[in-house]
UniProtKB/Swiss-Prot annotation:
Belongs to the p53 family. Residues 150-171, 257-306, 342-376 are annotated as: Disordered. GO terms for cellular component: cytoplasm; mitochondrion; nucleus. Signal peptide: none annotated. This is Cellular tumor antigen p53. The gene is tp53. Its cofactor is Zn(2+). InterPro entries: p53-like_TF_DNA-bd_sf, p53/RUNT-type_TF_DNA-bd_sf, p53_DNA-bd, p53_tetramer_sf, p53_tetrameristn, p53_tumour_suppressor. The record marks K95 as: Interaction with DNA. Residues 249-256 are annotated as: Interaction with DNA. Zn(2+) binds at C151, H154, C214, C218.
Length: 376
């Protein structure tokens, strides 16, 4: 019987690999739990984290919460590794245009609630699930912490085009049912998010249609304060892939305002550049010959030809003689001019001497044949 018992114990099947691993891990956990009582009792060689704990941490799902946003938004451009860029459709400079973009000012001029197409391009495809976020912020530093929202008048107006957008949001997306309107929990800034869609066949950019639902001059809203629109390309977890910024003005006549601001911008740039060059020249090498410098400054105006209208032929002949004399003085060298002056002076002096010699010395009038004396 004893032999049979020994045989039975010998015939017990060994546990498979899965059961063996569970027993081994259970043994390790028991040992580790016995050592977690006091930290000073743990030997130095067991201070490291056990492998099963590391494996369990690695197998747990990571949280997909987006990183917290800062109070002051970043408005600088960041193309990123994907070379994220923005483009705008070319528009005519007429006053009747509803949306126009100025490359010199990096500014978009548009009317209230009108379609503003923005073209976005990347050099390579972003990760799946990427989104495009558009946020409006104030441009000046004293207003940057405030939330850009619609004025009370437009916010209370019942508009059928609002759709799912909250009434206080300035930025809207047109023609995209997947647009999501969000409010940041830290800064309360309003933003609208749409999924990134790859360009269609034959196109290199993705187009998003935006609407601005309040004028820049509305009291209680923007109140003539300039705003910026920040468009970011983000992953599904909220990590930044690229950022672009442009200024926006919502007005009644975008074409007129663009032309006015561009002309003012060019006028401001001209005196700055000319002033800089003049100061640099004066500081480096002051002119040794002021007369020569004056001539060089006026050389451009001296070469121009002007037309003067004169009434009356006598005046015309008189002014023509003056002009001819000035033209001759420009052609004749200064040394020859001095010779001609000496000749003219000698002629005038000779005439005066001849006239003085012909007259009587004592002041009596010389008689002519036809004239008679008073006594006669």
């Amino acid at each position: 019987m004893e032999g049979n018992g020994e045989r039975d114990t010998m015939m017990v099947e060994p546990p498979d690999s899965q059961e063996f691993a569970e027993l081994w891990l259970r043994n390790l956990i028991v040992r580790d739990n016995s050592l977690w009582g006091k930290e000073e009792e743990i030997p130095d060689d067991l201070q490291e984290v056990p492998c099963d704990v590391l494996l369990s941490d690695m197998l747990q799902p990571q949280s997909s919460s987006s990183p917290p946003t800062s109070t002051v938004p970043v408005t600088s451009d960041y193309p990123g590794l994907l070379n994220f860029t923005l483009h705008f459709q070319e528009s005519s400079g007429t006053k009747s245009v509803t949306c126009t973009y100025s490359p010199d000012l990096n500014k978009l001029f548009c009317q209230l609630a009108k379609t503003c197409p923005v073209l976005m391009a990347v050099s390579s495809s972003p990760p799946p699930g990427s989104v495009l976020r558009a946020t409006a912020v104030y441009k000046r530093s004293e207003h940057v912490a405030e939330v850009v929202r619609r004025c009370p008048h437009h916010e209370r107006s019942n508009d059928s085009s609002d759709g799912p957008a909250p009434p206080g949001h300035l930025l809207r997306v047109e023609g995209n049912s997947r647009a999501v309107y969000q409010e940041d929990g830290n800064t309360q800034a309003h933003s609208v998010v749409v999924p990134y869609e790859p360009p269609q066949v034959g196109s290199q950019s993705t187009t998003v249609l935006y609407n601005y639902m309040c004028n820049s001059s509305c009291m209680g809203g923007m109140n003539r304060r300039p705003i910026l629109t920040i468009i970011t390309l983000e992953t599904q977890d909220g990590h930044l892939l690229g950022r672009r910024t442009f200024e926006v003005r919502v007005c009644a006549c975008p074409g007129r305002d663009r032309k006015t601001e561009e002309s003012n911008f060019k006028k401001q740039q001209e005196p700055k550049t000319s002033g800089k060059t003049l100061t640099k020249r004066s500081m480096k090498d002051p002119p040794s010959h002021p007369e020569a410098s004056k001539k060089s400054k006026n050389s451009s105006s001296d070469d121009e030809i002007y037309t003067l209208q004169v009434r009356g032929k006598e005046r015309y002949e008189f002014l023509k003689k003056i002009n001819d004399g000035l033209e001759l003085s420009d052609v004749v060298p200064p040394a020859d001019q001095e010779k001609y002056r000496q000749k003219l002076l000698s002629k005038t002096c000779r005439k005066e001497r001849d006239g003085a010699a012909g007259e009587p010395k004592r002041g009596k009038k010389r008689l002519v044949k036809e004239e008679k004396c008073d006594s006669d």
